[in-house]
A protein has these predicted regions:
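Long, amphipathic alpha-helical regulatory blocks in the mid-to-C-terminal portion
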Residues: 45-67, 97-110, 173-177, 192-199, ...
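Classical protein tyrosine phosphatase
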Residues: 85-101
Length: 323
């Protein structure tokens, strides 16, 4: 193995360790820490040191000219680390680097996967996670598939930023590993929801063109979002809460888009185009809060309130969810 390839693998593993430490809720054994003084540091402090180490080593070799899936994964972990450290612009920059390198590798082209039979499903997972991240970015955990279980942050929608990846390849298949089945189902549902947030939606949201959305198109989007998640599916409780809250959040974003487009009216025959529609979404959120355990809901914490700013007062949502 070449020195650059060794460094690349090292950077990926250390970046993964950095993110696990930043997110961890328990102290690692002192015996595994690289320096004795780290035993007195916080998890975030240890993770920050590991992150800086990975970034430092990565700067010592040419990682741009010949990218690999390891380099894309490393950038993905960097993005997650810097977001947790409240450096969102740096996190976005690394996410952009990851999507660019993914395109250089042809991960957006279905033909690429026909010539590389090894670990295809995992590479597809990585592409689709990047696809979702641009639209509704989230913090990755040590397992790519399990990153669906964590708290989310928005980029293309909340930050009005452009997207570069599109739904141009088949969805991943993880059926060959029975333990991955619930995760695969959840990922498939997330992919299907974010397919609806297409170029037309993002361009209207970002006001790229002077064109306006039609009432029929908005109604179609709301119909697709409302039917995107079945009444029952196999997954963990926390994952199901995340998926169902994401669905309601996307419905709220579509309603805000229709309001900005001047399509909302108190006399509209289409319920998604009325002022009462946010109340319907709020009721669905209330139902979700009653269906699942407090522990599963608390995973989302204050982020749940920040995702639905037009449901006033915010204290009411906190009362609904946590009381």
């Amino acid at each position: 193995i070449g020195m650059d390839r060794w460094k690349e693998t090292y950077c990926m593993v250390v970046a993964l360790c950095a993110y696990v430490m930043i997110r961890a809720n328990h102290k690692p054994p002192v015996s595994v820490l690289p320096r004795p003084e780290m035993a007195h540091m916080s998890n975030v402090g240890i993770g920050h040191i590991l992150l800086e180490e990975s970034v430092r080593v990565r700067q010592s070799y040419d990682h741009r000219e010949n990218p690999t899936h390891y380099s894309v994964l490393t950038l993905w972990f960097y993005s997650g680390c810097y977001f947790v450290l409240a450096r969102e612009n740096t996190a976005w920059t690394y996410l952009r680097d990851a999507t660019t390198q993914a395109q250089l590798l042809g991960m957006h082209d279905e033909e690429t996967y026909k010539h590389d039979p090894l670990d295809i499903s995992r590479k597809r997972v990585l592409y689709w996670l990047l696809f979702i991240a641009e639209r509704y970015s989230y913090k990755p955990t040590c397992s790519l598939q399990r990153s669906l279980l964590t708290a989310y942050r928005t980029y293309a929608l909340r930050k009005h930023r452009p997207i570069s990846l599109h739904p141009t390849i088949h969805s991943p298949s993880l059926d060959e590993v029975p333990s991955d089945r619930p995760i695969a189902v959840g990922l498939e549902l997330m992919i299907n929801m974010f397919r609806i947030i297409d170029d037309t939606f993002i361009n209207l949201w970002n006001r790229v063109h002077s064109t306006h959305a039609s009432a029929a198109w908005i109604t179609q989007v709301q119909t697709q979002l409302s039917g995107a998640v079945p009444a029952y599916f196999e997954c963990t409780e926390v994952q199901e809460v995340q998926i169902r809250i994401t669905q309601q959040w996307l419905r709220s974003q579509a309603w805000q888009l229709s309001a900005c487009q001047g399509l909302v009216s108190s006399v509209s025959n289409d319920i998604p185009l009325t002022f009462k529609y946010p109340i319907e979404i709020a009721r669905d959120l209330l139902t979700i809060s009653h269906q699942f355990s407090q522990q599963a809901m608390e995973v989302h914490g204050v982020g749940l309130v920040s995702r639905f700013p037009f449901f006033a007062p915010s204290a009411l949502i906190l009362e609904i969810v946590f009381v």
